[in-house]
Amino acid sequence: MSASALVCLAPGSEETEAVTTIDLLVRGGIKVTTASVASDGNLAITCSRGVKLLADAPLVEVADGEYDVIVLPGGIKGAECFRDSTLLVETVKQFHRSGRIVAAICAAPATVLVPHDIFPIGNMTGFPTLKDKIPAEQWLDKRVVWDARVKLLTSQGPGTAIDFGLKIIDLLVGREKAHEVASQLVMAAGIYNYYE
């Protein structure tokens, strides 16, 4: 059975983080389902910079699926929409309780995970200007933070979306596949390519 990911989208989600992650996961052979968390259930999502994305389904229709990871892109307005969605918060909690991976980038860790106390323990990172919203004992100033104790993956922002997507591939499919995908990209220096 192949790995699968549920990528949540909301009005104001950060498009670079969403699209980069989706693209890399597909390249890694991971089945991706995109879910709209828009309060009106609209599948057409206008992202933070005006780019329009079309979700596969409203979250209510796919939340109970057997996905291996739930992905929360950032973008402050999108993250606030996630934070205010009872269904989204409960879905994230269910992933955590069932031992599946929760992956959040940019504004999502500080705006969604922390206020709902979903990970009272667990190291994390996020958008640097939101550092004060994450407990000091949990904050790590790194491009990507994987805390295997609680199966939490976090990352900092649009410029770390490739690192984030590759780490999800590594976790779900393996290091070899992450390296294969990385080798197809012309990556900036400093991004780990899974080759060592």
From Swiss-Prot:
Q: In the UniProt record for this chain, what is stated about the effect of gene disruption?
A: Cells lacking this gene display highest sensitivity to carbonyl stress. The yajL mutant (but not the parental strain) suffers from a 100-fold decrease in viability after incubation for 48 hours in LB medium containing 0.6% glucose, and the mutant is rescued by YajL- and DJ-1-overproducing plasmids. The wild-type strain displays a small quantity of glycated proteins after overnight culture in LB medium supplemented with 0.6% glucose, whereas the yajL mutant displays much higher levels of glycated proteins, and also higher DNA and RNA glycation levels.
Q: What is its EC number?
A: 3.1.2.-, 3.5.1.-, 3.5.1.124
Q: Which family does it belong to?
A: Belongs to the peptidase C56 family.
Q: Which residues form the active site?
A: C106 (nucleophile)
Give the source's domain of life in one word. Bacteria
> Which reactions fall under this protein's catalytic activity?
N(omega)-(1-hydroxy-2-oxopropyl)-L-arginyl-[protein] + H2O = lactate + L-arginyl-[protein] + H(+); N(6)-(1-hydroxy-2-oxopropyl)-L-lysyl-[protein] + H2O = lactate + L-lysyl-[protein] + H(+); S-(1-hydroxy-2-oxopropyl)-L-cysteinyl-[protein] + H2O = lactate + L-cysteinyl-[protein] + H(+); N(omega)-(1-hydroxy-2-oxoethyl)-L-arginyl-[protein] + H2O = L-arginyl-[protein] + glycolate + H(+)
Q: How is its activity regulated?
A: Glyoxalase activity is inhibited by zinc ions. Active as a chaperone in both its reduced and oxidized states, and is more active in its oxidized form.
Q: Name one GO biological process term.
A: DNA repair
Source species of the chain: Escherichia coli (strain K12)
Annotated protein name in UniProt: Protein/nucleic acid deglycase 3
The enzyme's main class, written as a single word, is hydrolase
Instruction: List cellular component terms (GO).
Output: cytoplasm; cytosol
